[in-house]
Curated annotation (Swiss-Prot):
GO cellular component, one term: cytosol
Residue span of region G3: 81-84
Keywords recorded for this protein, A-Z: Cytoplasm, Elongation factor, GTP-binding, Hydrolase, Magnesium, Metal-binding, Nucleotide-binding, Protein biosynthesis
Any GO molecular function: GTP binding
Gene coding for it: tuf2
Catalytic activity: GTP + H2O = GDP + phosphate + H(+)
Subunit organization: Monomer.
Region G1, annotated ranges: 19-26
Record: residues binding Mg(2+): T26
Name of this protein: Elongation factor Tu 2
EC number: 3.6.5.3
Provenance organism: Photobacterium profundum (strain SS9)
Location of the region described as G2 in the Swiss-Prot/TrEMBL record: 60-64
Listed CDD domains: EF_Tu, EFTU_II, EFTU_III
């Protein structure tokens, strides 16, 4: 069977459903696929095939995730849905499925529940930029005032975690009704699709962002100088441009005098490419793995930050015992390990394998970072946790 060519004619946006258990995330995912396929064309997916989510491994962590795709006239969407709460936590923290926007599903019959709050908080911590609310099961609520009350509660909850609660679109619908082909509820799915198109801006492509290349290796080439190699994370580097070397040591700037790929000389290196960059007047010992090459001024080195962490369970190959304050593991950023100390939240004495928690981390050497950067927690090369930078202190 030949693979059909993927036509990238429309902008591509990543979204996903979040919210409390049994509020209808998977049913909504199936309803979106079904209704949009019916109205705009495409493949419908049924509930069972989405609910039966395959297991994936991301940085050694087992996560069950379903990926579906659907189209509106304006865009192509990739949508992730997770069967269990733990899968959401892991997914958001590892960034296994990056979201440009989230669809928060809240059952009108229950209103916001503990996981509703937890998913909103996680969304804030891991940098999901936009949230659209789908109030589900509205066909089971007769009281108009009750619906308004739930909407108000959800908006207040979003505002509490720094989302624009007053401005987030709220769509009142019934995923099951739409899945069963009831016209009034199908219309609400179309309304949700329009909200996705209008409320979530088109994500910036990696190539349009400022240049960053995490350094993997450093070579000295006789008569030509020092070459650093790695995969361009974002942006473009061109010959003759100034680049900064950031992290671990004092930041320095130099000039890119050459770019090569597979021994061919290029004018530029672009996001996603594995390249070697030749640096003017830089000595072999001035640069090391773990630093990044970046557009000067675009990213800064830091040592102290607030993070959201998932600790691997014993079954996932993580620790067998809890850890306490004063724990000093290595934090693996991009290409290297840096030792750091942790500070647990007030009232938390210990952290068990399988937990997720916020903690303040202080590294012994600075690393080039922005909020939203993912890292692994390791002990002697073995991964015991995953985390994301939520807020930078210094």
């Amino acid at each position: 069977m030949s693979k059909e060519k993927f036509e990238r004619l429309k902008p591509h946006v990543n979204v996903g459903t979040i919210g409390h258990v049994d509020h209808g995330k998977t049913t909504l995912t199936a309803a979106i696929c079904t209704v949009l396929a019916k109205v705009y064309g495409g493949d419908a997916k049924d509930f069972a095939s989405i609910d039966n989510a395959p297991e994936e491994r991301e940085r050694g962590i087992t996560i069950s995730t379903s990926h579906v795709e659907y189209d509106t006239p304006a865009r192509h969407y990739a949508h992730v849905d997770c069967p269990g709460h733990a899968d959401y936590v892991k997914n958001m923290i590892t960034g296994a499925a990056q979201m440009d926007g989230g669809i928060l599903v809240v059952a009108a019959t229950d209103g916001p529940m503990p996981q509703t709050r937890e998913h909103i908080l996680l969304g804030r911590q891991v940098g999901i930029p936009y949230i659209i609310v789908f109030m589900n099961k509205c066909d089971m609520v007769d009281d108009e005032e009750l619906l308004e009350l739930v909407e108000m509660e959800v908006r207040e909850l979003l505002s509490e975690y720094d989302f624009p609660g007053d401005d987030c679109p709220v769509i009142m619908g019934s995923a099951l009704g739409a899945l069963n082909g009831e016209a009034q509820w199908e219309e609400k799915i179309i309304e949700l699709a329009e909200a996705l198109d209008n409320y979530i801006p088109e994500p910036e492509r990696a190539i349009d962002l400022p240049f960053i290349l995490p350094i993997e290796d450093v070579f000295s080439i006789q008569g030509r100088g020092t070459v650093v190699t790695g995969r361009v994370e974002q942006g473009i580097v061109r010959i003759g441009e100034e680049v900064a070397i950031i992290g671990i040591k004092e930041t320095t700037t130099t000039t890119c005098t050459g770019v090569e790929m597979f021994r061919k000389l290029l004018d530029e290196g672009r996001a996603g490419e594995n390249v070697g960059v030749l640096l003017r007047g830089t000595k072999r010992d001035d640069v090391e793995r773990g630093q990044v090459l970046a557009k000067p001024g675009s990213i800064t080195p830091h040592t102290t930050f607030e993070s959201e962490i998932y600790v691997l369970s014993k079954d996932e190959g993580g620790r067998h015992t809890p850890f306490f304050k004063g724990y000093r593991p290595q934090f693996y950023f991009r290409t290297t390990d840096v030792t750091g100390t942790i500070e647990l939240p007030e009232g938390v004495e210990m952290v068990m394998p399988g937990d997720n928690i916020q903690m303040k981390v202080t590294l012994i050497a600075p690393i080039a970072m922005d909020e939203g950067l993912r890292f692994a927690i390791r002990e002697g090369g073995r991964t015991v946790g995953a985390g994301v930078v939520a807020k930078i202190f210094e």
